[in-house]
């Protein structure tokens, strides 16, 4: 009975602040220690100057390794280089929370994160993206502020691209292989108005802005992404959003489209 109660409390503590569980960026908060989640990300993006749709499927296994550390393992699949879904690579992501200033219905947290990615697909755009496109690394910090039903989060990171596998060279030159990424995300809990059970469905609305500046060329892009999120039984979630380019001087092959995330969490696994 005690283990069941602990699992329920973990679920409530994780998803009662679901308005900070953003879709395109990670908050500074971590998964509960001992938890494991299975996540599937789907991107359905319109290719420029074409009727083709770029579909990327990225399944992830995420582990709450400790109170401060979480680790994620992802695989990259897409239809871009073939007419069927093809495995193209994978990544390892880690996040370490180094600051927590918590109070009732509010907190401020900061974390450092890093990603190492390997990809075998052709390099087809100037944008540097470690989540399904480039081989390389990304490292940065994230700060998240929760104030009752509203969450604000911001990230700052640097990304470095290398040649992709399969003899797919980074064709834009060594000088243009680094970029600075930054983002600002806003989330608000819409329903329920009052909590009476951890089984209540949560509905959150979010808006995320994402920007990249290439340190060599100075070229940039700015995107905006509205998202609606559903949390079920404090254990699973579905996010549906639309990402749209606001401005860009970088070559990008698919700058707008829909994304869908499905995730299920297991608490107190180890």
Q: Language-model segments: what does each one mean?
A:
Residues 4-13:
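Sec-dependent N-terminal signal peptides
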Residues 18-154, 158-163, 173-270:
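Transmembrane beta-barrel domains of Gram-negative outer membranes and organellar outer membranes
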Residues 168-170:
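Extended low-complexity, intrinsically disordered segments associated with secretion/export
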């Amino acid at each position: 009975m005690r283990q069941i109660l602990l699992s329920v409390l973990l679920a409530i503590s994780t998803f009662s602040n679901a308005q900070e569980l953003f879709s395109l960026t990670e908050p500074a908060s971590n998964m509960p220690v001992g938890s494991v989640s299975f996540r599937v990300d789907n991107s359905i993006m319109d290719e420029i100057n074409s009727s083709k749709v770029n579909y990327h499927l990225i399944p992830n296994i995420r582990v709450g390794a400790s109170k401060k550390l979480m680790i994620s393992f992802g695989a990259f699949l897409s239809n871009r280089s073939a007419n069927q879904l093809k495995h193209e690579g994978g990544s390892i992501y880690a996040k370490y929370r180094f600051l927590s200033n918590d109070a009732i219905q509010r907190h401020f947290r900061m974390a450092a994160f890093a990603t190492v990615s390997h990809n075998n697909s052709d390099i087809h755009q100037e944008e540097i993206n470690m989540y399904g496109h480039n081989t390389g690394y990304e490292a940065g910090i994230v700060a998240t502020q929760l104030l009752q039903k509203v969450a604000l989060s911001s990230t700052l990171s640097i990304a470095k691209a290398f040649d992709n596998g399969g003899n797919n060279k980074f064709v834009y030159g060594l000088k243009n292989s680094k970029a600075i990424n930054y983002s600002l995300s806003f989330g608000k809990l819409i329903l329920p108005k009052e909590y009476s059970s951890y089984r209540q469905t949560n509905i959150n609305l979010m808006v995320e802005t994402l920007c990249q500046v290439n340190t060599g060329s100075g070229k940039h892009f700015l995107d905006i992404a509205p998202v609606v999120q559903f949390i079920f039984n404090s254990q699973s979630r579905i996010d549906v959003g639309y990402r749209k380019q606001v401005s860009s001087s970088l070559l990008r092959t698919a700058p707008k489209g829909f994304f869908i995330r499905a995730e299920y969490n297991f608490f107190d696994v180890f």
